[in-house]
UniProtKB/Swiss-Prot annotation:
Motif PTAP/PSAP motif: chain residues: 95-98
UniProt membrane topology term: Lipid-anchor
Gene Ontology CC terms, in alphabetical order: host cell endoplasmic reticulum membrane; host cell plasma membrane; host cytoskeleton; membrane; virion component
Note: The viral particles present in feces and bile are non-enveloped, while those in circulating blood and culture supernatants are covered with a cellular membrane (quasi-enveloped).
Record bears the keyword Ligase: no
Region entry Interaction with the capsid protein, spans: 47-71
Region entry Interaction with host HPX, spans: 27-67
Phosphoserine modification, residue list: 70
Stated name of the protein: Protein ORF3
Region entry Homodimerization, and interaction with host AMBP/bikunin, spans: 71-113
Reported function: Small multifunctional phosphoprotein involved in virion morphogenesis, egress and counteracting host innate immunity. Plays critical roles in the final steps of viral release by interacting with host TSG101, a member of the vacuolar protein-sorting pathway and using other cellular host proteins involved in vesicle formation pathway. Also acts as a viroporin and forms ion conductive pores allowing viral particle release. Impairs the generation of type I interferon by down-regulating host TLR3 and TLR7 as well as their downstream signaling pathways.
Post-translational modification: Palmitoylated in the N-terminus.
Length: 113
């Protein structure tokens, strides 16, 4: 077994690396550790993320920042706007531009305006 860490996980030096353990915490705070652990919650520089390990290969932190609801982001407001924004002035076309991806309905993802 190992010793419990701040996240309530056990640090087993032979099989996994716990990012909150000072012994295994990388100096750069970017997790590039090797192990066969499954998705384990971790905190890296105040941003919550998951260690994803589909196979016994190097695993990395995928940051999942949680923004407060009062955070003002003009880009997000544009994305939530139901009216399409003009991409170019009238009469100007760009035939080499790739097609736009389909619009994701944000309420289906559990986000509220």
């Amino acid at each position: 077994m190992g010793s419990p860490c701040a996240l309530g996980l056990f640090c087993c030096c032979s099989s996994c690396f716990c990012l909150c353990c000072p012994r295994h915490r990388p100096a750069s705070r970017l997790a590039a550790v090797v192990g066969g652990a499954t998705a384990v919650p971790a905190v890296v520089s105040g941003v919550t993320g998951l260690i994803l390990s589909p196979s016994p290969s190097p695993i990395f932190i995928q940051p999942t920042p949680s923004l407060p609801m009062s955070f003002h982001n003009p880009g997000l407001e544009l994305a939530l706007d139901s009216r399409p924004a003009p991409l170019a002035p009238l009469g100007v076309t760009s035939p080499s531009a790739p097609p736009l991806p389909p619009v994701v309905d944000l309420p289906q993802l559990g986000l509220r305006r």
